[in-house]
């Protein structure tokens, strides 16, 4: 799918709702979808899958599910955006960039650069590696949603 078609899907709240259920193990709920001339802001909420954290962290730090609030801000003119992820009830956050790059007349690639930071002495590295190891494939799966979606 080309960049204009991919951006049109991101601008469609129905696609974003569908995409939120597309990634196995990470169900996102659309909180808000704001579109103006050239800026799109998408806010989603989900729960961090317990398997994304090392076992020692699951038992030591987490007493209830970790809520994830994700904000995607897209500059539609540049086909580029930022991602911000806040983890609630866990000491961590993530942020990064996203870009839609044309690879042909009707094809494009959605790529992410994400930084994950855990604020836990001694365990931070293990948490960051574990979450990153799961987040990368989840974002890749969401990128695949662009070509898997069929307009209802």
Give the ranges of each region predicted by the language model:
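Short, solvent-exposed secondary-structure boundary motifs
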Residues: 16-25, 59-65, 87-93
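Hydrophobic ligand-binding cavity/cleft-lining segments
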Residues: 1-52
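Glycine-rich portal/gate segments that line the openings of hydrophobic small-molecule binding cavities
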Residues: 30-85
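Beta-strand/loop substructures that line and gate deep hydrophobic ligand-binding cavities in soluble
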Residues: 40-42, 71-73, 79-133
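Hydrophobic pocket/interface hotspot
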Residues: 6-10, 112, 146
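Alpha-helical membrane-targeting segments
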Residues: 51-65, 117-137
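A conserved amphipathic terminal alpha-helix motif
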Residues: 68-71, 124-152
């Amino acid at each position: 799918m080309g960049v204009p078609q991919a951006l049109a899907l991101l601008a469609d709240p129905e696609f974003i709702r569908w995409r939120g259920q597309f990634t196995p193990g990470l169900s996102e709920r659309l909180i808000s979808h704001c579109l103006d001339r050239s800026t799109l802001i998408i806010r989603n909420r989900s729960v961090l899958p317990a398997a994304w954290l090392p076992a020692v962290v699951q038992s030591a730090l987490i007493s209830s599910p970790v809520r994830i609030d994700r904000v995607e801000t897209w500059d539609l003119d540049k086909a580029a955006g930022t991602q911000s992820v806040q983890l609630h009830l866990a000491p961590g956050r993530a942020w990064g960039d996203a870009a839609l790059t044309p690879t042909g007349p009707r094809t494009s690639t959605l790529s992410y650069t994400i930084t994950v930071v855990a604020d836990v002495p001694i365990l931070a590295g293990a948490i960051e590696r574990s979450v990153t190891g799961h987040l990368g494939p989840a974002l890749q799966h969401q990128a695949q949603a662009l070509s898997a979606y069929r307009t209802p």
